[in-house]
């Protein structure tokens, strides 16, 4: 059980005790009234029965009735005063406890009505006073006793007036405390509403901060991912640059080899022309010698030496031709490799352009601004002299 429930139960218990005391005071008043009525009836019976000592008996009965009325009135006043005193204090304590804790409920209107009715019931009845006065005036035979009774009645009136005044003040105090309780309760409810609103706003703010933190974490992850992609792109870009440099170097070497092949081909053509001229001159000399007739041994020996030298030159030319063919084959393979490098380079550039955030322009200029040699044709037909073997070929 929480503190709030315990305090509420204690307040209810105190209220029940106050009601119980009110009922006890009321029962005491009713008992006193019954005694007064019973004694009044006894007095009337005695008055109706005349005896030798009527005056004395009437005085004694009157004194007894007055004394009993005074005692009962004082007892009722004391009990009522105690109950009235205890009731406001207890109610005040209940209200204070309820206001201080801001948790107790205000007393119901029915309880207040019951308390007021009990307070009214606790008062000495006016009819009893009138009956007492009537009995005193009708039965008293002595003016002194009558004056005493009047003084006692006046005292009772004064006590009742004081008690009524005190009860009125206590009721006003209860009303003031009830109003203060209602005001404080309204303020407490308003404070609880504001506190609830603040709690809701704090919860919403915490939820927003958690979502913002999650969003920041996602952004950081994306940034790390983008940084990784950027690093990957930089690596690829560097790799492309290195490959481009290698391709340029390879292209440069191919151009140098092509230049050397062109020079070798030109030298070969010049030597071939020289060989043809020498062949023609040798054929011409052979015809002149055959037309003259017999030749001397020296001329025959010279011709043989000439033929041997020509055959040696033809073999040398054939060897150079073979070397040239091999060079052409290597050149063709190099051109195929160069074309494959160009294709691979274009694929890498296309992959780079497809990456998100890449530039739309090409990073490197196209180095393939020269014509690829698709066909090399070399005609080396050597059939212009005896013993020569023609070996035509084409690339």
Curated annotation (Swiss-Prot):
Question: Biased composition, Basic and acidic residues: where in the chain?
Answer: 103-133, 144-155, 276-290
Instruction: Mark out the compositionally biased spans (Polar residues).
Output: 42-71, 81-96, 291-300
The UniProt keyword set, sorted, is: Coiled coil, Cytoplasm
Residue ranges annotated as coiled coil are: 224-351
Q: GO CC: one term?
A: cytoplasm
Region: Disordered, residue numbers: 17-155, 276-304
Q: What is this protein called?
A: Uncharacterized protein C713.09
